[in-house]
UniProtKB/Swiss-Prot annotation:
Native source species: Mus musculus
E.C. no: 1.8.3.5
Mutant phenotype after disruption: Mice are healthy and fertile, but show an accumulation of prenylcysteines within cells. Significant accumulation of both farnesylcysteine and geranylgeranylcysteine in the brain and liver.
Coiled coil, from the record: none
Name this protein carries in UniProt: Prenylcysteine oxidase 1
Amino acid sequence: MGRFAAALVGSLFWLGLLLCGLGSLASAEPRAPPNRIAIVGAGIGGTSSAYYLRKKFGKDVKIDVFEREEVGGRLATLKVQGHDYEAGGSVIHPLNLHMKRFVKELGLSSVPASGGLVGVYNGKSLVFEESSWFVINVIKLVWRYGFQSLRMHMWVEDLLDKFMRIYRYQSHDYAFSSVEKLMHAIGGDDYVRLLNQTLRENLKKAGFSETFLNEMIAPVMKVNYGQSTDINAFVGAVSLTAADSNLWAVEGGNKIVCSGLLQASSSNLISGSVMSIEEKTRTKQTGNPTKMYEVVYKTGSETHSDFYDIVLVAAPLNRKMSNITFRNFDPPIEEFNDPYQQLVTTFIKGELNSTLFSSRPKDQFGLSAILVTDDSDMFINSLSIVASVRQKEGPPPAVDGMHVWKTFSRDILTKEQISKLFLSYDYAVRKPWLSYPHYEPPQKCPSIILHDRLYYLNGIEFAASCMEMSAIAGYNAALLAYHRWNGNEDMIDQDDLYERLKTEL
């Protein structure tokens, strides 16, 4: 999704991020590891936590990963005429260090994100058209917006410079018991405050114009999160990090990272739906009673249950998505009613009706992606030419003027709407889903620790939802479970980490 933002503002946004190594480090003398760990959800959060739990607890613990659909979760592909296309999380930043590490350690290959020129449409005309010449783009941006793009770069760079501290903290095995404490350790009160104000409010206070917000910032939010500049300021900044010309994806589909992590962690995949989780007292072979979690799940028409020492929930607990019942907890596990945003991804092979966007003859229309402003009356969030997950060189040349186009929209496109977009088309294949949280500051992130040894990863999505954030959450949950199991309280919620670690190489 972030590919469009890259083409749009990459001319002036260069995001320098701090690189940190991800080595293994010594810790306190651990007690005997748990016998069994359950992970609910086989997306990037669940599979990355399995990967790191295996590294921390060793080879003897049994790890079961439950998935009711396909491994990969919202890193999904859609098969169109025999070719697979990214329908969910599509691109990866060159300095997303966890994803970069996974690809390297799993022996996978990367492909560059689809290229091409981008335009911004306001419902009447193109208010910005990217040129293939860098200098011309700079002139266009400065002429229309002054130096606001440069100022925007500086704002985002400052936020991300702090955010990249998380890699150093995690490389030293530090964990956090809440999303807010993680955010505070990264950037203090100012960082946490980003969750409690809208992106528009933040940028207006910083002096950015309505024109710049409407034409440059809002379209990026719309394509990346299907929402407006009223999202929280932190997820807005994350969205703008897609302004990089070196975005990439995993050859064969980003979801194969998840299956690779499952295999690397020697986890047992259980294809079924978790129905309930309940704490119960069990008697071990030694005769000592111990608290464990009974996980009840359904495979096909059969219901089963197993007991686990530790449970990690790596799937949204919104009732429309997971529908897991937490039985007999005292106090009760909190309810999760925060809404998720509906998104419809549609792949259409057709000849674009370029006159809808420009009066230029179609043979002179060179845009490969179109973003739309908030004030347009368009029924789509974006439109772009895409390549399949196995096409290393990008989208193939047009055949009879036809490309495979990918659209994002809030609702399913009607035949009339598709016919308005395309002069002719061969097919339209769609996938509707609840893709990411609906952001509405002030943002309260769900708890990570639901019970003594019951953890929830997806609360981090309410700060920002993307592949790398899920991988960070997976690593954090694994470290948190490990340290709490072994009583390493000095490795949790340490606020002075930046000062303590900044002098280390």
